[in-house]
């Protein structure tokens, strides 16, 4: 019995080793799981379910194969792929979740999220996030021709990269008070998230009890997953 969590794969055709590693993961490790949760940024960018990128179809088929084998797959949007919609969910068999979700895992309540909403010290990013998550802005963007959406997405990624290069690492990490507030709001002692690309298990206090924040790593030179069993919560790095 085990439930698996991954995040921040940033899949793109320019990184075939990561794509191949994910396909192996779906065919091997994930097949033994009770469920797989993808906590955002599965793709490097997503400009709409109507994008004919062959990689998207390949990943949908692979995930659907996992689901058809009896392993449900759940997805929380990240800051790169927040426009993944019902069409891709239907094609892949994934179940879309809200940005925050509490799971009962073998008697242990665990809060899961992508993690970008925890980085409240980065006021610039949070303001940008509020704009792009505005439903009417998203609807307007999705009505644009694909070639225009690609240009906008490329400019946004370039702008984000330039902005992050001038920010301190602390600003781009989670805010400790925000973490505790979220855990106490949901009354949990465990939090699993991605986004920061800083894999670690942090001990803290929430609800006047010991608590733990488990951060998934990004898939760059190695894969990263959290494995929850009835007896343990493990952060595991593995070769791609």
Swiss-Prot record:
Question: EC number(s) per UniProt?
Answer: 3.6.1.54
Quickly give the catalysed reaction: UDP-2-N,3-O-bis[(3R)-3-hydroxytetradecanoyl]-alpha-D-glucosamine + H2O = 2-N,3-O-bis[(3R)-3-hydroxytetradecanoyl]-alpha-D-glucosaminyl 1-phosphate + UMP + 2 H(+)
Where along this sequence does the record place binding of Mn(2+) 2?
A: 41, 79, 114, 195
User: Primary place of residence?
Assistant: membrane
Q: Which residues bind substrate?
A: 79-80, 122, 160, 164, 167, 195
Q: Which Pfam families match?
A: Metallophos
Enzyme class (EC, first level): hydrolase
Q: Name one GO cellular component term.
A: cytoplasm
**Pathway the protein contributes to:** Glycolipid biosynthesis; lipid IV(A) biosynthesis; lipid IV(A) from (3R)-3-hydroxytetradecanoyl-[acyl-carrier-protein] and UDP-N-acetyl-alpha-D-glucosamine: step 4/6
Upper lineage: Bacteria, Pseudomonadati, Pseudomonadota, Gammaproteobacteria, Enterobacterales
Subcellular location per UniProt equals: Cell inner membrane
- Example GO molecular function term? manganese ion binding
Q: Which residues bind Mn(2+) 1?
A: 8, 10, 41, 197
Query: Which family does the record assign?
Result: Belongs to the LpxH family.
Report if keyword Magnesium is assigned: no
Any binding details for the cofactor? Answer: Binds 2 Mn(2+) ions per subunit in a binuclear metal center.
Function noted in UniProt: Hydrolyzes the pyrophosphate bond of UDP-2,3-diacylglucosamine to yield 2,3-diacylglucosamine 1-phosphate (lipid X) and UMP by catalyzing the attack of water at the alpha-P atom. Involved in the biosynthesis of lipid A, a phosphorylated glycolipid that anchors the lipopolysaccharide to the outer membrane of the cell.
The Gene Ontology biological process terms listed for this entry are:
lipid A biosynthetic process
Q: Which organism is it from?
A: Salmonella schwarzengrund (strain CVM19633)
| Mode of membrane association | Peripheral membrane protein
**What is the required cofactor set for this protein?**
Mn(2+)
Q: What is this protein called?
A: UDP-2,3-diacylglucosamine hydrolase
UniProt keywords, alphabetically: Cell inner membrane, Cell membrane, Hydrolase, Lipid A biosynthesis, Lipid biosynthesis, Lipid metabolism, Manganese, Membrane, Metal-binding
């Amino acid at each position: 019995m085990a439930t698996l969590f991954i995040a921040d794969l940033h899949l793109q055709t320019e990184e075939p080793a990561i794509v191949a590693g994910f396909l192996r993961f779906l065919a091997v490790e994930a097949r033994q799981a009770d469920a797989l949760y993808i906590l955002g940024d599965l793709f490097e960018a997503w400009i709409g379910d109507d994008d004919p990128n062959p990689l998207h179809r390949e990943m949908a088929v692979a995930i659907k194969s996992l689901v058809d084998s009896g392993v449900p797959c759940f997805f929380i949007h990240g800051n790169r792929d927040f426009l993944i919609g019902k069409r891709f969910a239907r094609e892949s068999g994934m179940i879309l979740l809200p940005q925050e979700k509490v799971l009962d895992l073998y008697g242990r309540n665990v809060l899961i999220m992508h993690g970008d909403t925890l980085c409240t010290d980065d006021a610039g990013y949070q303001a940008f996030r509020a704009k792009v998550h505005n439903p009417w802005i998203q609807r307007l963007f999705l009505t644009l021709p694909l070639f225009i959406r690609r240009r906008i997405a490329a400019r946004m990624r370039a702008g984000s990269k330039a902005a992050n290069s001038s920010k301190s690492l602390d600003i781009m990490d989670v805010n400790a008070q925000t973490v505790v507030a979220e855990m106490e709001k949901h009354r949990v002692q465990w939090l699993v998230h991605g986004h920061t690309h800083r894999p670690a298990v942090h001990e803290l206090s929430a609800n006047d009890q010991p608590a733990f924040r488990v951060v998934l790593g990004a898939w760059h030179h190695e894969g990263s997953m959290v494995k929850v069993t009835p007896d343990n919560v493990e952060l595991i790095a593995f070769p791609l």
